[in-house]
Amino acid sequence: MSVTAESPSLRGGSILENKQELIDLKNIGEHARTVQPFKTSKHQPLIQGSVSKEAAIATHSALHFDLTPEKEKKIRDMYDRLDADNDGSIDIRDLTQALSLQAHIPASVAPKLLERMKSEHSDRVTYADFTNYVIAHEARLAEVFDKIDLNSDGEVDMAEIKSYCKEMGVNLDDQKAMSIVKKMDQSGSSSVNLNEFQDFMLLYPSTDMRDMVDFWRHNLIIDIGEDGQVPEDFTPQELLSGVWWRHLVAGGVAGAMSRTCTAPFDRIKVYLQVNSTKTNKLGVVSCVHLLHAEGGIKSFWRGNGINVIKIAPESAMKFMCYDQIKRWMQEYKGGAELSTIERLLAGSSAGAISQTAIYPMEVMKTRLALRRTGQLDKGMFHFAHKMYTKEGIKCFYKGYLPNLLGIIPYAGIDLTVYESLKSMYTKYYTEHTEPGVLALLACGTCSSTCGQLASYPLALVRTRLQARAISPKNSTQPDTMVGQFKHILQTEGFTGLYRGITPNFMKVIPAVSISYVVYEKVRKQLGATMT
């Protein structure tokens, strides 16, 4: 007894041929061992040749017959948004561009996300790949959601987020836990359902519980408004694994590159702070010509060496002091997590201690930036020895008081203005639960500018006190902070308190950009990932 079987195959594009073969049913077992299965490897994308994107989407949607029309539309809309160049597939550029427009998923995860989405031997994501990723990732996220949802009521609230993070070794206070909930909550219910959780975490490539907690902690709580004011927090696990020193090294290298590249702006600023007056009308352009004529191109980097050298001791001391002060404050509170204001206070205190320790290097930086050609022939240590011999130990702490007083106003005003602008944005743009990246950058820029405007007069007085002994025209000026303020207001008016602020603002964008790019590169090379 035999039966005829038809096996379809595609040849030459659309030509369909039927191949007939006789199968002896007595030897069906032997035959089965020789038959090639229909699908022996991962599917190949159907978007090939002249097949349109719409036709490919329709074909792949038909393969997932269990999807509802609403779900299909949601996946299709998301795929279209990610496919920035509309070429029918998603590559690394599409993902990076899409994530850069998201307020909560960092663009740095784009390579890992692409790896999770694409087929094994491809560098692009087809609609079929994306659909498979969404279905599988949402299933894994549902499992994570069930673990967080302790009372199984279908909603995750602040207490459950707090408990979940504690289980992963991260203690959060109520304010921080609620911050995470608010970022995910789309309905304003102060809790998160499964759909909201899946939507929020869909483009974050990991469902590992530890990774997700790190992502929440470093991207949903601490944002750009606090950068530079409060040192980075590290969990006990990160301290033990060495993540902390990798981030400090990355920050040090980034700071060195940023300061070196923007050193000319810094030297112009210092020169204008000390030498610009109402009568000589010395400006940025005339200052550039003057400095170049005196010492050439290299003169614009005077004082940069010690400015770079002081990064390491200052960063290390600030980190250690911040960690110790935090522990004391937490012990005083009975182990509770610190609030934002308390962290700001701890960070400012750590900054004050580290500034006190390295302040002599700050004074030397100012004097080296103002030196003339030939005044450093015997090296930096000889330069410091000359200062000590001529003026005594006190010279290394000239301008210390205005420097110390400038720390808290800058940090406090920066953070206050930032939070106020964020609140105003969400109040007037109610359709957005959280500001986007551009809005956050605008808030951060405005708050930083306000902080600088408030603290700049103190910085100017500090610089003049540091340079008073080596500046003949300033040697008759008062040797105290209050005396300097009175002298400037009487002789130059209110605008005299802002001499040199133009190059200070000019260096902000290149300094931040260089620092961010270098930090990310070095951090990745060292394997210090916390998101």
From Swiss-Prot:
InterPro entries: EF-hand-dom_pair, EF_Hand_1_Ca_BS, EF_hand_dom, Mit_carrier, Mitochondrial_sb/sol_carrier, Mt_carrier_dom_sf. Solcar repeats lie at residues 242-328, 338-424, 435-525. The keyword Protease does not apply. GO terms for cellular component: mitochondrial inner membrane. Residues 70-105, 106-135, 136-171, 172-207 form the EF-hand domain. It is found in: Mitochondrion inner membrane. Belongs to the mitochondrial carrier (TC 2.A.29) family. This is Probable calcium-binding mitochondrial carrier F17E5.2. It comes from Caenorhabditis elegans. The lineage of its organism: Eukaryota, Metazoa, Ecdysozoa, Nematoda, Chromadorea.
